[in-house]
UniProtKB/Swiss-Prot annotation:
Polar residues: compositionally biased ranges: 36-45, 131-144, 187-197
Protein name according to UniProt: Mitochondrial nucleoid-associated protein 1
Region annotation Disordered: where it falls in the sequence: 29-88, 130-205, 222-269
Lineage: Eukaryota, Metazoa, Chordata, Craniata, Vertebrata
Annotated GO biological process: cell population proliferation; mitochondrial DNA metabolic process; positive regulation of mitochondrial DNA replication
Species of provenance: Mus musculus
Amino acid sequence: MGAAEPRMEVCPYCKKPFKRLKSHLPHCKMRGPSISADQNVSQSKPAALAQKEKSPTRDLTRAKEKELEVDRPKRAVKAETSRASWTAAASPLPEGILGSVRITKAEGENKDQNQFSFQALSQAKPEVTLQRVTTPWSPASDATSPKRELTQDVSESKGSPCPSETEAPSLVSSVEPFLANQDRKYSSTQPHANPATSVGLKLGTVDPQRQKLRVKLLDVPLSDRHSPKSGSHGVQRVTPSVLSREEGSQDGGHLLGVSAHPGNTKTQKSESLLLGLHTGLLGKAPVREHQELGLGMELSQSKGNTENRMSVTNVQEGAGLGQGGKDPITATKAKPHTALELRNVFMPESGNQSLTSPAVTSTPEENAQFCGQSHVPAITLSVGSVRDVLEPTSFYQPHTAQAGHCLMSYSAQYPVPKTFVGHVAAVTSGAPPRSVGLEWFPELYPAYVGLGVLPRRPPPWSLAAQVPPLPTLQGRSVSKVPWWGRSSADSRSLEPLTLTTSSLPLMRLLGAVHKGWVQCNTTIKKSGVGGLTMLFAGYFILCCNWSFKHLKLQHWRK
C-alpha cells in the first residue's frame, strides 16, 4: 500500500483518488455542474498542481479549496471592474467624439486605475479624460467623481460658465434636425436617458456641459475643413449634389448635375455630363466656376414617317443666354427653344450590313446662338477603313451613307480649336502603311464590314469591282496606302487603286495567293473537323520550330 500511494492522484472535482487522472477528467460527472463562471479561467490550475505533486493528501486539497474560496471574491471584484469599464465605454458619452480609447492599467493592492482618453477627430479641440478609481463606494467619493472632473475640465478649456439645465433641451432640439439630415450618421440625442450606474462611476445622468460639448462638436462643418471661414460661421449643412433628378414639367426628363441648393454657387461646381457622345472626341468640356450647368435629355421615338429626335437642353450662364445666376431649373422652363434637335435618322440607301447613320441638323436660331456666323466642325468617322477623314462641314451639309461603311457623324456642341483639327488631319494624312501579314487573318478584325457570323465566299477579286462611281469620290480624300499594305476589307472598299509599274508584279502575286488563302480559310471554317485539324497542325509546327531553335539539338545528341 505504501508503494501504491504516491501513484494515486486526487481529482479536484469529485475528490476521489485515481491512478490515471488524465483518463478520468474527461468523464468526471462532477466537473460540469460544480464549476462556476469564475472557476472556468483556472480550471486547469489545480490539475496541473496535482500532477506535479506526486503525493497529495487531503489536507493539501482542503487548503487549495480554501484558497479558491478566498480568491472568489477577488475574481468577482475584477469581473465587476471589467464590466464597469465596458459600461463606462457604452454609456452615452458625446457621440461626436470618435477616436482611439487608450487603456492603461496599474494594479495595486487596493486600487485599480483605468484611464480612458478620448481624442476627438481633426476639428474636435477639447480632450476629455476620465479617470476612474475603484474603491469601496461611498457618498464622499461622489465629490471626486468623473462627472465632476469632466465638468471642470470642459469649463476650464472653454472659459465660459456652465449653461443652465433649461438650455440643454433647446440645444438638443437644435441639433436633432441637423442629425436627421446627415442620413442618421449620428443617433439623435435623448435628453431624458436612463442613468447607467456602475461601481464607483456615474455617467448616465444628463449633464448640461456634456450636451454643450456635443453641440459644439456637431457645429463643426464637415465639407470645408481647411477653409478659414469654417471657424467663424455657424452650422454649415453639407449639400450633396443631386446627380439625377426627375422634374415633372413639360420638357420632362432627367436634370443632370443640378444641385439641391442652386443659390449656393461658391461651394458647388456642377460638371456637365455629355452622355458619352463628345468625351472621346472633344475631351473634357470646360466647366466654369460660378456657373450652374444643367443638362436635360428628352428622347421621343415614333415609328413610320414621324420624326425620331433626341433633344438636349443645355442651360448656361453667359453673354449669349444671359440668365444672370438664376435657378437652372427655371432657366430650363423659361427657354425650351434652346434645345438642339438631333434628328433625321435614316437608313443608308444600299442594302449592305451597315448601321444607321445619325446626321445632325438644326435651325438658324440655334446656329446663331451656339455657333455664331462660323460653322462648327463636324467629325466624320469611317469605320473599317484607313480613310478616316476629319472635315470641317456645316450643319446644313447632308451626309450620305456609302456602301460597305458605317458613317457616324456628330456635330460638336462646343467649338473645336483649329489646331486640334489640323493636328488630327496631319496624323491621318501622314499615317504609315499597315504592316504586311495581318491581312491574311481577317478574323482578327471583327469590326470590318463584310465579315459576318455565317461563312460565305468572298467577292471576286477584279479591278472593275475596285473602281467606284464618280459621285462617291466627291469631297473625299484618296488614301495613299498601297494596295499590298491593306487588309482584305480595305482591298474590297470603293476606292480607286493607286497602281505603279514597280508594284504591279508583286500585286498580282499577292492577289492570287491572298485569294486562294481566303477561299481555303472559308471552306475550312465550314467543317469543324478540318478547322481543328488545321489548328493542331499549326500548333505542332510552331512547337517543333521553337524546340529546334532553342534547344539546338543538344538534348538529342545526349
